[in-house]
Amino acid sequence: MNPLLSFCNVSFGYEDRDVIRSASFDLQAGSCTALIGPNGAGKTTLLRLAAGILQCRSGNVILNNESLYKFAIRDVARMVALVPQQLDIPFQFTVREVVEQGRTPYLGFLRGPLREDRMAVDRALELADVTELQQRVFNELSGGERQRVKIALGLAQQPRLLLLDEPTQNLDIGRQIELIDLLHFLHSEGITIFASIHDLQLVNGNFSSALLLSPDMPLMSGTPEEILRPSLLEKAFNCPPQRHPLLLERTQRSEKRAG
């Protein structure tokens, strides 16, 4: 089966500094993949490359068996949606008005929203469980509510691939669990999920595959169990196992098996 998205020896940098170096990996259709790595490793940059917002310096990004750069921006946005960390809305837009912006790739120069656009917005609100918030002002919502609305905005694009940039950041544990449950549900609906995750303890058991991005080592891909090995994480995060509960727990488990 051909991957939905592939990075083929992709490099990208700002001015004279490379952020992504010779990155290669595949995202299979229907997969649920976590992207982990230390701050400043380039996770946001990698997601923006996957969404076609940035263009790689060398290599290629393949989307649905074609070079992503052969597609018009509108066509990429119909297949891939990026949920950013921050969404700044300068006006007092309602939740519904924000989510309606996700239909932009489908609107023509002289064509306003059609019935199918309204239905897509209704469905996105429903999937993200924010239908009851649709008449609320976006800027007056809590952090957890805003996160769900941002996901609804992405879903209104009706993408095959949903990219999320640290969706659980700044959420308390209850809200984190709710959001992970939402990602599980969207995955069950056939949407391919690719999310950068700050809390490593959310990765195992919630994602089918994982990528590890670090400035000090090549991009690593595998199952969560393979990627969350203490030896890899210690090198990637420059953190001794005894200083992080997840690393300590996994190191102790490995020692017990060895004994």
Can you say where each PLM-predicted feature lies in the sequence?
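ABC ATPase nucleotide-binding domains
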Residues: 231-259
